[in-house]
Amino acid sequence: MVVELKNIEKIYENGFHALKGVNLELKKGDILGVIGYSGAGKSTLIRLINCLERPSSGEVLVNGVNLLNLKPKELQKARQKIGMIFQHFNLLSAKNVFENVAFALEIARWEKNKIKSRVHELLELVGLEDKMHFYPKQLSGGQKQRVAIARSLANCPDLLLCDEATSALDSKTTHSILTLLSGIQKKLDLSIVFITHEIEVVKELCNQMCVISSGEIVERGLVEEIFANPKHAVTKELLGIKNEHGDQKCQDVYRIVFLGEHLDEPIISNLIRRFKIDVSIISGNIEELTTKDIGYLVVRFLGSTTETQRALEYLNALGLQVEKLKD
């Protein structure tokens, strides 16, 4: 495991219980989206991973090493393998792009003759090789975040922490940053933890996700599995799953989930012909995830109890997820 958080509790001096019994694992190469509402404990959690915050109790293991047991110099060295980017970029305004990236290498005591080539390599990676002499005030928000990404990768980390890294960006720039991170992850075989309150970020970038609420992880798993079958009320709210049946009563109203391979199949029309049952489509949509697409239909079966039961058995036999909606 790249990251293991074990039985984490975080209680601040004012008595606020920010994290409660948190257990979390991250495997090599995974991109984990941690999502939740403001004040849920997301930023506290990510700052524990590199010990910018220390837990009240529990263990923080990165690559098998408990960071809480390290001496200050040992912790500083371990942090060099953990990159981090923030919502507001944290660039040095008095230094240009080249100098901002080089600064991370200077702190790590790289040899001067190696710093120049490494900075050029990093700026090429993030598409800013033509901006190396620009200062932060001359850059757009997206360009500033690219500089921050380059700086975070300076010491060849195997783990990248992103704390609301796209929250200050517009949707087009957010997409370009997520595309960049996805490409970098594949090229460098990084593991990424991405804190966000934006479900679109999870959809576009992540293969794993966890939902945090009031300091607790309430749901954790593959992105497509949670999108297909969310269990916790907070997860359903974040995914926008609420009152899909409108003002209609829920008698014989069902939510059907279509995973990847079934999206292009005429399943509903086949069901109507095969079982001589009428189907009223109340709502539907398709979620495009980074791993696979998922389709949803909310339908009402208009037929006898026997016909409805046969239709449900048919859908279950196809491996579709079918949930009867409640009032």
Swiss-Prot record:
> Which top-level enzyme class is recorded in the Swiss-Prot or TrEMBL entry?
translocase
SUPFAM superfamilies to which the protein is assigned, alphabetical: ACT-like, P-loop containing nucleoside triphosphate hydrolases
Q: How does it sit in the membrane?
A: Peripheral membrane protein
- The set of disulfide-linked cysteines is none
Task: Give GO MF terms, alphabetically.
Answer: ABC-type D-methionine transporter activity; ATP binding; ATP hydrolysis activity
Q: Which Gene3D superfamilies match?
A: 3.30.70.260, P-loop containing nucleotide triphosphate hydrolases
PROSITE patterns named among the record's database cross-references? ABC_TRANSPORTER_1, ABC_TRANSPORTER_2, METN
Signal peptide start-end: none
Q: Which reaction does it catalyse?
A: L-methionine(out) + ATP + H2O = L-methionine(in) + ADP + phosphate + H(+); D-methionine(out) + ATP + H2O = D-methionine(in) + ADP + phosphate + H(+)
Could you tell me which residue ranges the ABC transporter domain spans?
A: 3-239
GO-annotated cellular components? plasma membrane
Q: Which InterPro entries match?
A: AAA+_ATPase, ABC_transporter-like_ATP-bd, ABC_transporter-like_CS, ACT-like_dom_sf, MetN_ABC, MetN_ABC_transporter-like, NIL_domain, P-loop_NTPase
Q: Which residues cross the membrane?
A: none
Its assembly, as annotated, is: The complex is composed of two ATP-binding proteins (MetN), two transmembrane proteins (MetI) and a solute-binding protein (MetQ).
Return the protein name. Methionine import ATP-binding protein MetN
Q: Which organism is it from?
A: Helicobacter pylori (strain HPAG1)
Q: Gene of origin?
A: metN
